[in-house]
Amino acid sequence: CKNFKDAVEDDPLIKEIIFLDRYTKKFIHIFKLSKILKKYKFDNIIIYYPSVRLYLAARLANIDHISIYPLFRKKGLHLVNAAKKLTEKFLNIENCPTETEYFIKKSDLNNSIKNVNSDYFKIVIGAGSSGPTTRWGAKNFSNLINKLNTNGKYFFYILCGPNEKKIEDEIVSNLNKDNFLRLSDKSLKEVIPFLCTSNLYIGNDSFGSHITAQSGIKSLVILLDSPKSYTDYSKNHHRIIPKGYNISKITHGSNISPDLIKVEDVYSLVKNFEKN
């Protein structure tokens, strides 16, 4: 959430972002949060979470129109469908689109590619993620990159967070060519232009795949421990799951072995998407 401001800084439709990082955990915080909400004199509030605390805080803040998911129904909540339905009701529209237009300055986009040969096919390697059970693994990524480098012209953006430098180091130390750029030492605002000018995303379910998908870029997302609903909203998401698994059954706690997704299979998918 703290990075959201950087992610949408260039969007002309967003006037202001107010980040509330306190008073959202305990029941007693309802009263403190309501005072903050009341200060802004909101006419409407839309809450994309079935939170009793937020609902009561909004009521105490005398906000006239409160839109929220059905309370006490968190289990089985489909993130995309629930958000879509709530937005349609709030805006009084039908069939709210789930694809969006991602805004970024043209100068930032141009700067991100000025040192990359225009003949190269640029691939984001999304090696980082929210937790170890969702990761395909550094070894698999380095093997994939090396295999691709034997048959094509590529440039790779190694996408890992600042706390995932060890993963990045492990990938880079096993590469046979120097056609890559590390992104772990860059801020989110610095990273985004590289993602938006790439040709393909390959990696774990992470923020990078959402940025690329919403930039109209094909995104191959490896699902090992994430619900399919996380990637249901975009036509640019293409899920990779182990053979024999039902995608609807994969969710938090599945703990599927990353080695069940073979490098050769991912390589074949990349070559196919490269042609198309």
Question: Language-model segments: what does each one mean?
Answer:
Residues 1-276:
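Catalytic machinery of carbohydrate-active enzymes
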